[in-house]
């Protein structure tokens, strides 16, 4: 698990129908959230927030993360987004997030992180799958550091949040 308590406004970029954000808000009653995804996706999000009892603390915004993301958050979440894309496309997405984040904010990248060298066969299979299917890839911590640096972020911390998922905390530079 990851501690979202330090943040007052959390934007979940490409957050689907809002399951992650609804759970974050349910566990943190003082927070507000913004769910951001394509119009046809967020159109189905209302019942998720209603069921969690957090509809009054969440805005649902439709848009395109290649163009802009909602501004004013002190945390922007990207869960299992970067592994879908190649580096150049990710830099475009990350620079859009960089323009929107508060100077003291954090970008929270939730992804599987490959072990260096050739460890972890199941993660390597996931990497191959991401390459073949959508054209993306799984990355090592060092590859994430480079990708984020190219997008004007620096990695502040990496927190293991569960099996096969870590939270990469990145700060704007």
Question: Language-model features: where?
Answer:
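Alpha-helical subdomain
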Residues: 3-173
């Amino acid at each position: 698990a990851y501690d979202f308590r330090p943040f007052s406004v959390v934007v979940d970029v490409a957050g689907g129908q809002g399951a992650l954000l609804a759970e974050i808000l349910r566990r943190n009653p003082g927070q507000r959230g913004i769910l951001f995804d394509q119009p046809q996706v967020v159109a189905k999000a209302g019942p998720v927030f209603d069921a969690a009892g957090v509809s009054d603390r969440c805005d649902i915004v439709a848009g395109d993360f290649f163009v802009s993301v909602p501004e004013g958050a002190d945390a922007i979440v990207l869960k299992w987004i970067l592994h879908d894309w190649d580096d150049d496309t990710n830099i475009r997405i990350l620079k859009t997030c960089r323009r929107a984040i508060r100077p003291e904010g954090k970008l929270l990248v939730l992804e599987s992180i490959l072990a260096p060298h050739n460890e972890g066969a199941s993660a390597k299979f996931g990497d191959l799958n991401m390459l073949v299917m959508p054209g993306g890839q799984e990355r090592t911590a060092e590859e994430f550091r480079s990708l984020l640096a190219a997008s004007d972020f620096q990695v502040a911390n990496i927190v293991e949040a569960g099996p096969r998922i870590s939270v990469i905390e990145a700060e704007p530079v």
